Amino acid sequence: MNMLTALLVNITLSMLLIIVAFWLPQLNLYTEKANPYECGFDPMGSARLPFSMKFFLVAITFLLFDLEIALLLPLPWAIQMYNIDIMMLTAFILVSVLALGLAYEWLQKGLEWTE
């Protein structure tokens, strides 16, 4: 199976699932289904509390650097390859882009909790 066939099959299945999801109505939507579930007890308060934007920015930054580690973990195995220069250049570019992003976030005071 060549790459084009696999791509077409994946796109077709994805579009089919999206179309079916939009065409099917939301059946039996009532207030009990829309309420949050807290271990069988009635909720003590509202579950729709506002989310801290500062925490969100720190969490996204953490996820980006976690992704960096996940992408750099195969580096020791890549060193065993014949073309080490391309792998090291790619790793350097990845770390540089993320370091520039962190520096920009730091200069914009996006990581500080106090206003």
From Swiss-Prot:
Effect of V20I: In strain: Austericus and Rufinus
One BP term from GO: mitochondrial electron transport, NADH to ubiquinone
GO CC, alphabetical: mitochondrial inner membrane; NADH dehydrogenase complex
One annotated GO molecular function: NADH dehydrogenase (ubiquinone) activity
Residue ranges crossing the lipid bilayer per the database entry: 4-24, 55-75, 84-104
Effect of D85N: In strain: Austericus, Coolidgei and Rufinus
Protein name in the entry: NADH-ubiquinone oxidoreductase chain 3
Organism for this UniProt entry: Peromyscus maniculatus
Taxonomic path: Eukaryota, Metazoa, Chordata, Craniata, Vertebrata
